[in-house]
Amino acid sequence: MGIEVVVLLTTLMLDAAVGEPPALLHPVVWYGKLISLLERAKFRKMLVEIFYGAFCCLIVITFALILSLLPFPYPLNFLWAVYLLFSSISVKSMVNHARVCVESGVDRKAVQMIVSRNTEELSEEQLCSAVIESVAENYVDGVVAPLFYFSIFGVAGAVVYRAVNTCDAMVGYRKGRYEAFGKFAARLDDILNYIPARLSLLFFELLKRGAFSYGLKRNVKLNGCAIAAMSYLLGVKLEKPGYYSLPGIEPSAADIERAIKAFVRLTVIAVIFTTIAVSIRIVLLTKLHF
């Protein structure tokens, strides 16, 4: 068994036990603080703002890459690799956040913790929809994408992806103050998510036949096919008022629980896929070496 497979399995056990690192020691928090610090500079010309935003995003990416390449001796290098991959995925923390929403009676403040839209304007069904959509999106951002890049580039791939994803989450807005500054981060995140988002549809297909084609046809945004697939899998209406509406029955708190169970099953599938992909890469690299 290759060392990267051991890193992956150890990471998953750590995630199941802990959930996520404390904020002070969380690399994703570091990326967020760094981009927040850099974005304070303002420029009047949009083109200059776009290039400066790209420069800042590249600084965060470089910082993340340096973290993944720090030359620790064994076994510290193994532990560091586990920690970085652990901080790049989000399984238990997503499950916990979604369950808090259910246990609170789908309270607006609880839902606001995991979505960017204004929950004060949403009905109870729309609040449930927002949570389910968040679970579906996190399956791509917090599971499939980091594991996909880990399977190709090792820990560095997962870490760099997470840095880009964090920049997008912080400043990658299509409108408002970050429209120019966050353009590069938003576009780069779209590019990096393109394959993982569609790969996730294959995993949905294993749970319900037809999910792959439905996700492609009903893609609510560039990489929102997992939302469409989750709607199809659960048979519920998922909507973001003013943006998209997927047909189905009105969602309830019980459907959030169903989404959580589906998320866990889909994560197991993604882990199996990643283990196989990493093993194949190791075998191919070994043959090329000899």
From Swiss-Prot:
Q: What is the lineage of its organism?
A: Archaea, Methanobacteriati, Methanobacteriota, Archaeoglobi, Archaeoglobales
User: What is the protein's membrane topology class?
Assistant: Multi-pass membrane protein
Return the protein name. Probable cobalamin biosynthesis protein CobD
Q: Which GO terms describe its molecular function?
A: ABC-type vitamin B12 transporter activity; threonine-phosphate decarboxylase activity
Membrane spanning segments where? 5-25, 50-70, 71-91, 140-160, 266-286
| Signal sequence extent | none
Organism, by scientific name, is Archaeoglobus fulgidus (strain ATCC 49558 / DSM 4304 / JCM 9628 / NBRC 100126 / VC-16)
GO cellular component terms, alphabetically, are: plasma membrane
What family does the entry list? Belongs to the CobD/CbiB family.
Q: What does this protein do?
A: Converts cobyric acid to cobinamide by the addition of aminopropanol on the F carboxylic group.
The cellular location(s) given in this protein's UniProt record come to: Cell membrane
